[in-house]
Every structure is written in structure tokens, then in C-alpha cells.
Amino acid sequence: MTMEEMKTEAEAASMVSMPLYAVMYPVFNELERVNLSAAQTLRAAFIKAEKENPGLTQDIIMKILEKKSVEVNFTESLLRMAADDVEEYMIERPEPEFQDLNEKARALKQILSKIPDEINDRVRFLQTIKDIASAIKELLDTVNNVFKKYQYQNRRALEHQKKEFVKYSKSFSDTLKTYFKDGKAINVFISANRLIHQTNLILQTFKTVA
């Protein structure tokens, strides 16, 4: 397996784990108000299981929905829920540049998560697309500002993640162009989820090396 194939496989594995933090983390947070110890134990168990078996959380959720005969567009629902902050990804450094990075990432995710509500209104959706483009630019500008001000030993990892984010941003743009031809909204939802995931990975990478 080539290095590029290994990176692709790793990205796919982490992408399939999105339901853990988008769906289950809010559940754990609610449970903490009732039983802190049980919530922490359950969270740790899910994290461990998901790490060892990427996609397990999604499989569990899908099985529950199937058993309850609940029909839901899981990809769309995931997109709606994926805007929330994830503590494990948020950068804790107090410097303004890092907090600005948190804020810009949050803004982009929130706009992307609104796509299901906007996509059927062409005028509103076109405005949303403009807002997404602006949010992407602002996030990249903030990433570059951090690069300029701070030196990192593991700069290569940061550069790689930035390139991945740009790649998925372009892919999202291409998906939008196709959508206006074929009208398949599900592909837009999938691409938006991937872009949200890459946004989280930017935060995670900075948090790891900062």
C-alpha cells in the first residue's frame, strides 16, 4: 500500500467516525447532568470501541433506527448535527490567533449545517454558497496568520492538513456545480459533511502540535 493510499484509508476511517461526536457526544453531555460517572464511563467505552472499530457507532445508530422502524436521511441528519463544537478538537491556547481559528471553524461548520434548510430555495441557497466561500477564505486566512506568527516543529503535518482542506473545499465546489445539473442533494450533503470533517481535522492538528 502506498503512502497516499494509507492516508486515504486513514481519512476514510476517521470520516466514518463522525457520528460518534456529532450524534453521541451531545447524548453523553445530556447524560452527564443526570449521572456524571455513568456518562464518562459510556463515553470512554464508545471512544475506545470506535477507535478499534471505526464506524461502529454509526452501525449501532443505524441498527437502532432500523429496529424502531424510523426512516431518516442519516447523511442529512448528520450534517444538521455536525456544527456543534467538539471539545476534543477545540484549541485551548488563549492567544487571539488560536481562538480566532476556533471561531472561524465554528462559523464555517454552522453555515454548512444549514444547507438542508436552504437547498430547496434557490435564492437563499445561492447566498449560502457565497457565505460558505467567504467562510472558507476566512478560515484559510486565519490558518496562514497562525503560520506566520508561530513556528512549529511538525509544520509538515499542518501543511498537509491545510492542503487536504483545500482539496475538499474544491471538491465541495465541484459537487455544487454537478448539483445544479442533476439536482441530487444527497451528494451535496455528503460533500458538506466531508468538509466539516476536514475543518475539525485542522483544529485537531493545530491542537496536537501547538
Swiss-Prot record:
The keyword Mitochondrion does not apply. One of its GO terms (cellular component) is Golgi apparatus. Keywords: Acetylation, Angiogenesis, Apoptosis, Cell membrane, Cytoplasm, Golgi apparatus, Isopeptide bond, Membrane, Ubl conjugation. It is found in: Cytoplasm; Golgi apparatus membrane; Cell membrane. It is a peripheral membrane protein. There is a cross-link at K184 (Glycyl lysine isopeptide (Lys-Gly) (interchain with G-Cter in SUMO2)). The modification N6-acetyllysine is found at K177. The keyword Cell membrane applies. One of its GO terms (biological process) is negative regulation of blood vessel endothelial cell proliferation involved in sprouting angiogenesis. It holds the Pfam family PDCD10_N. Homodimer. Interacts (via C-terminus) with CCM2. Interacts (via C-terminus) with PXN. Interacts (via N-terminus) with STK25. Interacts (via N-terminus) with STK26. Interacts (via N-terminus) with STK24. Interacts with GOLGA2. Identified in a complex with KRIT1 and CCM2. Interacts with KDR/VEGFR2. Interaction with KDR/VEGFR2 is enhanced by stimulation with VEGFA. Interacts with RIPOR1 (via C-terminus); this interaction is required for the association of RIPOR1 with either STK24 and STK26 kinases and occurs in a Rho-independent manner. Promotes cell proliferation. Modulates apoptotic pathways. Increases mitogen-activated protein kinase activity and STK26 activity. Important for cell migration, and for normal structure and assembly of the Golgi complex. Part of the striatin-interacting phosphatase and kinase (STRIPAK) complexes. STRIPAK complexes have critical roles in protein (de)phosphorylation and are regulators of multiple signaling pathways including Hippo, MAPK, nuclear receptor and cytoskeleton remodeling. This is Programmed cell death protein 10.
